[in-house]
Amino acid sequence: MNFTQDWFSHNIPNFEFCMNALQSKQDFLEIGSFEGRASCWLLQNGLDPDGRLLCIDTFQGSEEHANMNLDGLFVRFQQNIEEATQADQVVEFYRTTSYEGLARAISSEYRYDFIYVDGSHTAPDVMTDACMAF
């Protein structure tokens, strides 16, 4: 897998705790995917072998990424996901804002066993993402 950033690894103990507490690991939602490091961890360590992961991201970065070269970000995400996905797992992605992606997810009537909110880091956006996701 090809990652240029690691903003996730410090979360692994918390993710392991959550995975151990879950009764069902069939449907996961991730808001904010970037290169897919958390997505890949979920695919390899949490999600059932026949589970479904929905990733929502614009793949354009935000204010905090202004000085980063994001060329190829979406392609890198796709390649990382392809490498991490197990046989019968399904990975869907909505390449849009979290607001639009979550509105679409709500209309699909899926219920998620695990939701990871890591899109925009502004308080109003995080609150909106959390409320819409649950």
Where are these regions (language model features)?
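S-adenosylmethionine/decaboxylated-SAM
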Residues: N2-F134
